[in-house]
């Protein structure tokens, strides 16, 4: 008949309330928060009777250790106690208050309210589902490629392989086939495919090469005749204007001039005038022109009575061309 033992949560409560294990105390009894000494065995000053007392008591309670029968193994005691604490559904670690390093390392835990029957059922169903998933994964892992290779290696082949080889031909049959087969000329390999080339576009160095040199066509005879007619008409119009303007030759002090002012008298009034060439003088602008002689000495006061209606300042004297 199996021996019934106390569960871990009530056993822990009893150990905390007994105050027999150093460092195992309540931090907040109302919230059920307590601490457990968790000093590492490699730290200086570690004592098996002081720092591993709780883990040894739990090993004795579970029957995994009996004094005098086995060698003390504090490392295994601590690992078993940690796994048992993590498996409890109603105890959780308060990680923000725990200290895992140093000589004063402790772990802080909180005892939660006891689970109801419904919560226990849900937890059991969840654990069963997890166990089934693990079993499926394990079965899938067993059917690895190694099993297939083992199955292939276990299959044996027959010792007699004569059925796999083709039957040999008789030499006489081969000679008959060669006689019946027409002589084949050596195959001449000829490629009928066009050569594959990459199209390359040649671009001229300058834009002047893009346009061809072109010569303008010569004008037709009809167009040339039209231009000559227009030039001839222009000359005739100029001559008519000169005839109608009434230019008259005059001679003053032996110098010849042309006058077109209204009211001008014929040459008989002024006397005999003759045209005379004037020397060519270079003008400031670089042009060659004809200038008249000095007319300061000429007395023209008698012309005031004859040419009263005429505005003398507007008279323009033009020398005769040679």
From Swiss-Prot:
Keyword Repressor set for record: yes
Modified positions (N6-acetyllysine) in chain numbering: 78
A Gene Ontology term for the protein's cellular component: chromatin
UniProt keyword annotations, A-Z: Acetylation, Activator, Antiviral defense, Cytoplasm, DNA-binding, Immunity, Innate immunity, Isopeptide bond, Nucleus, Phosphoprotein, Repressor, Transcription, Transcription regulation, Tumor suppressor, Ubl conjugation
GO molecular-function terms, A-Z: DNA-binding transcription activator activity, RNA polymerase II-specific; DNA-binding transcription factor activity, RNA polymerase II-specific; RNA polymerase II cis-regulatory region sequence-specific DNA binding; transcription cis-regulatory region binding
One of the GO biological process terms: regulation of cell cycle
Superkingdom assignment: Eukaryota
Regulation: Activated by MYD88.
SUPFAM superfamilies cross-referenced by the UniProt entry: Winged helix' DNA-binding domain
Keyword Transcription regulation part of the UniProt annotation: yes
InterPro entries: Interferon_reg_fac_CS, Interferon_reg_fact_DNA-bd_dom, IRF1/IRF2, WH-like_DNA-bd_sf, WH_DNA-bd_sf
Segments of this protein annotated with the region Disordered: 92-164
Pfam families for this protein: IRF (PF00605)
General function of this protein: Transcriptional regulator which displays a remarkable functional diversity in the regulation of cellular responses. Regulates transcription of IFN and IFN-inducible genes, host response to viral and bacterial infections, regulation of many genes expressed during hematopoiesis, inflammation, immune responses and cell proliferation and differentiation, regulation of the cell cycle and induction of growth arrest and programmed cell death following DNA damage.
Protein name per the record: Interferon regulatory factor 1
